[in-house]
């Protein structure tokens, strides 16, 4: 009563009128409208009309929002069935937004359960769209659903090619993966007029197309597709030891799929995480097949890899860009528990297959790798040791010690100095101090500057990485002495006599120790384990510190040496060597 306008007099008569209008059941807007219409026929100054006047505030409260009352279909909670959201999407943009948000990143249900939910929800509703969508979803598995956003779905042809790669890899290792986990998840049921493209004989093709024509309902169609996929896997696995027959059938399958691409409808498959999971499971189970025969190939050859494989493209080897997916069940010692294994043999040119420590002695194949597989060339990444504390480079075997039993240090690859050392050694790793001077070939095989990639077949292997204001130098030289003489032209100051620099020994090991803040090989504390780009904790102090001294004291095990005569040559390059190395190792040289 205190919120009434000032012109509204409070009297017992008005109180009775107020109670009769707002507290009793006559307070609905329709009753009020009838009473107002009957009173409106009276003259304006009639006392009966004046005493029944209502405040404007209460009238606004009663009549303002009657036209905006929500319909009951919007007040109902959104069900899990996609049809109700589809039907509401025609009327409400909010329902369309809710449908889009609920389907992002969520895998599609299998065709049988989705068909059941569609048919059960469209019993009471005679809308033509719901019935047609239920039929379409049974046959084509969400053929072009424009109201749902599926960013990770693939087309049917890629799915079938991926399935071909899965079946060939699984059957070749002698371990047949169940069809429910590999093919039926990734490739949904085909349309009735499309035969399976991976047929190995014309009779089988006619039988499959006849089976597909006979099956009309989606459930029987899915069963027929499972049968044909099983027949395909049996046909592909009929000769698991012969690689040429499997790859030939895969090529025939690709030709058939290209031929049928015009007649095939686009089949939307499930989320690609399901496809990748099934690929991983099939390749893992094929790699871990318990066969004593070591000649059985665990991965398909390069031509028979399907186009659905996701692989990084290496700029260093343009011909080989598809890496097979690693297996997750091959165990070996070290903390990297078998997560990165199984690269093809063309990435491992110089390793001895007899030194492979796994039971799958595939010729020319080395199972070790590293977590940086996609970021670096495979011919460099294959040689990293599987021991997490032994990260030396096998092409420089003088750096490795005899205590690391898991390294594959092949002396035949010593002269093939492919990609230089990138990983640091652990500071507790025991090495041979005398092995550097034991063989001249091993010391010559190690590159002069251990940053920057050098191609294995490069005629001029030594490149100048000096970066000035005008850009990098990028000149190449055949020997390290020529490169050292060229570097003196960069570092020589105008007022410094060249005789000061001539007394410094110009050999490979001493130059490398100079530019990496290491003692020369003749000093008593020489540690060849420190020849690395990102050094152990003592070498990490040798980076360029703008507010510190030029030479910081290192770890006790790594004594820093002083260069009194060669300071004009030594200090400018040594301060920036770590930064130049990290830039060139990432491909910016």
From Swiss-Prot:
GO cellular component terms, semicolon-separated: cytoplasm; histone deacetylase complex; nuclear matrix; nucleus
Gene Ontology MF annotations: DNA binding; histone deacetylase binding; zinc ion binding
Compositional bias of kind Basic and acidic residues: 137-148, 251-262
Positions of the UniProt region annotated as Required for interaction with Groucho and hdac2 plays an important role in repression of transcription: 408-460
Gene Ontology terms: biological process: adherens junction assembly; brain development; cilium assembly; determination of left/right symmetry; embryonic camera-type eye morphogenesis; hindbrain development; negative regulation of DNA-templated transcription; negative regulation of homotypic cell-cell adhesion
Subcellular location: Nucleus; Cytoplasm
Positions of region (Disordered): 102-315
Transmembrane segments: none
Region named Required for self-association and nuclear localization: 498-589
Bias type Polar residues, positions: 179-188, 214-230
Subunit note: Self-associates. Interacts with nlz2. May interact with Groucho corepressor proteins.
Family: Belongs to the Elbow/Noc family.
Purpose: Transcriptional corepressor which does not bind directly to DNA and may regulate transcription through recruitment of histone deacetylases to gene promoters. Required for segmental gene expression during hindbrain development. May regulate cell adhesion, migration and proliferation.
Protein name: Zinc finger protein 703
Gene expressing this chain: znf703
């Amino acid at each position: 009563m205190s919120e009434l306008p000032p012109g509204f007099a409070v009297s017992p008569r008005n109180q009775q009128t107020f109670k009769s209008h707002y507290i009793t059941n006559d307070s609905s807007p329709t009753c009020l409208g009838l009473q107002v219409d009957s009173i409106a026929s009276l003259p304006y100054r009639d006392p009966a009309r004046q005493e029944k006047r209502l405040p404007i505030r209460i009238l606004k409260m009663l009549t303002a929002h009657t036209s905006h009352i929500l319909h009951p279909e919007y007040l109902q909670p959104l069900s899990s069935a996609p049809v109700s959201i589809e039907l509401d999407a025609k009327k409400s943009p909010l329902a369309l937004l809710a449908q889009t948000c609920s389907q992002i990143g969520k895998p599609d249900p299998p065709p049988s359960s989705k068909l059941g939910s569609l048919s059960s929800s469209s019993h009471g509703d005679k809308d033509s769209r719901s019935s047609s969508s239920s039929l379409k979803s049974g046959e084509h598995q969400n053929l072009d659903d424009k109201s749902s956003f599926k960013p990770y779905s693939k087309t049917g042809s890629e799915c079938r090619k991926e399935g071909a790669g899965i079946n060939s890899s699984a059957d070749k290792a002698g371990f047949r993966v169940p069809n429910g986990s590999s093919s039926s998840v990734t490739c949904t049921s085909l349309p009735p007029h499309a035969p399976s493209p991976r047929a190995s004989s014309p009779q089988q093709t006619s039988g499959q197309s006849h089976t597909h024509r006979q099956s009309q309902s989606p459930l029987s169609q899915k069963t027929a597709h499972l049968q044909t996929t099983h027949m395909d896997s049996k046909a592909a696995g009929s000769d698991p030891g012969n690689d040429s027959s499997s790859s030939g059938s895969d090529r025939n399958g690709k030709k058939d799929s290209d031929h049928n691409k015009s007649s095939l409808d686009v089949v939307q498959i499930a989320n690609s995480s399901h496809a990748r999971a099934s690929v991983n499971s099939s390749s893992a189970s094929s790699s871990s097949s318990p066969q004593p025969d070591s000649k059985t190939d665990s991965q398909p050859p390069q031509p028979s890899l399907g186009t659905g494989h996701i692989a990084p493209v290496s700029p260093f080897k343009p011909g080989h860009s598809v890496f097979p997916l690693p297996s997750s069940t091959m165990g070996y010692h070290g903390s990297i528990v078998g997560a990165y294994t199984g690269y093809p043999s063309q990435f491992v040119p110089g390793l001895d297959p007899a030194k492979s420590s796994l039971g799958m002695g595939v010729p020319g194949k080395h199972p070790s790798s590293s977590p940086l597989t996609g970021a670096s060339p495979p011919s460099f990444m294959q040689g990293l040791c599987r021991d997490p504390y032994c990260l030396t480079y096998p092409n420089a075997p003088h750096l490795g010690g005899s205590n690391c039993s898991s390294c594959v240090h092949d002396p035949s690859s010593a002269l093939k100095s492919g990609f230089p050392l990138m990983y640091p050694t652990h500071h507790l790793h025991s090495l041979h101090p005398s092995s550097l001077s034991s063989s001249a070939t091993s010391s010559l095989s190690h590159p002069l500057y251990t940053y920057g990639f050098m191609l294995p077949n490069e005629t001029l292997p030594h490149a100048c990485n000096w970066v000035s204001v005008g850009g990098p130098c990028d000149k190449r030289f055949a020997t390290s002495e020529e490169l050292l003489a060229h570097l003196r032209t960069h570092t020589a100051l105008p007022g410094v006599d060249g005789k000061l620099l001539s007394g410094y020994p110009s050999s490979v090991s001493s130059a490398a120790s100079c530019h990496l803040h290491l003692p020369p090989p003749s000093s008593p504390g020489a540690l060849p384990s420190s020849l690395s780009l990102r050094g152990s904790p003592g070498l990490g102090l040798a980076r360029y510190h703008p507010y510190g001294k030029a030479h910081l004291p290192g770890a006790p095990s790594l004594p820093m040496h002083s260069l009194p005569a060669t300071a004009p040559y030594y200090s400018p390059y040594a301060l920036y060597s770590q930064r130049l190395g990290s830039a060139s190792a990432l491909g910016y040289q």
